[in-house]
């Protein structure tokens, strides 16, 4: 495969690089092994976090967390709740549930990433048309002082959960298990 030929050269020249690929579906561990990438995007987890909070049915999320645990045996997935190709999480499930999605993202195994603007509670709906990404890819203001103060609580939550993550580096490869699972309630434990 192309990446298996190219990435060793990249890593030889840049030994501290960390390479991940955007993979929507497929055999994630096999793709990692054959490509020599360090990680890939964990779309299954993204979708199940969003869907569980949107429908208030946590069984899909529990199932995908079990799969996620299995992925962690082979590699550490790049996890997210928003990116450049999807409707923003605050638009999809509302700001309160977006905060819960962030809490899940930051308390399960993986390498979490934050899509720019999500830390400010940006909204935007992806549309299937020419220019349909424009709403989810807005221009940032010229300086932080120009940001709306409406995003301040979301920003502070991001700061707190990122700090939690930094204080607990074991979360990188933590395994997650259900403690209590019902349609509208899900308590889980992450351990390493």
Language-model region placement:
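Short, solvent-exposed helix-loop connector elements
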Residues: 89-93
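Acidic/polar loop patches that form or flank catalytic/metal-binding clefts of enzymes
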Residues: 20-21, 111-118, 169-175
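Solvent-exposed loop/turn segments at secondary-structure junctions
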Residues: 25-27, 83-87, 120-122
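Carbohydrate-binding surface patches
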Residues: 178-192
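Conserved active-site segments centered on acidic
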Residues: 107
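Conserved interdomain hinge at the start of the Helicase C-terminal
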Residues: 98-100
């Amino acid at each position: 495969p192309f990446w298996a030929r190219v990435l060793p050269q990249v890593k030889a020249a840049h030994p501290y690089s960390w390479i991940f690929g955007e993979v929507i579906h497929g055999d994630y561990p096999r793709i990692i092994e054959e490509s020599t990438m360090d990680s890939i995007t964990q779309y299954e987890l993204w979708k199940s976090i969003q869907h569980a909070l949107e429908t208030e049915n946590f069984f899909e999320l529990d199932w995908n967390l079990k799969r996620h645990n299995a992925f962690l045996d082979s590699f550490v997935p790049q996890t997210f709740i928003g990116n450049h190709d999807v409707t923003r999480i605050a638009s999809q499930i509302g700001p309160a549930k977006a905060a819960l999605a962030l809490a899940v993202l930051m308390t399960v195994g993986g390498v979490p990433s934050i899509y720019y603007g999500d830390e400010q509670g940006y909204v935007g709906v992806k549309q299937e048309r020419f220019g349909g990404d424009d709403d989810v890819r807005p221009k940032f203001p010229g300086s932080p002082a120009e940001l709306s103060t409406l995003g301040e609580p979301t920003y502070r939550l991001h700061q707190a959960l990122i700090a939690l993550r930094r204080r607990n580096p074991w979360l990188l490869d933590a395994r997650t298990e259900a403690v209590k699972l019902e349609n509208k309630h899900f308590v889980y434990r992450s351990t390493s």
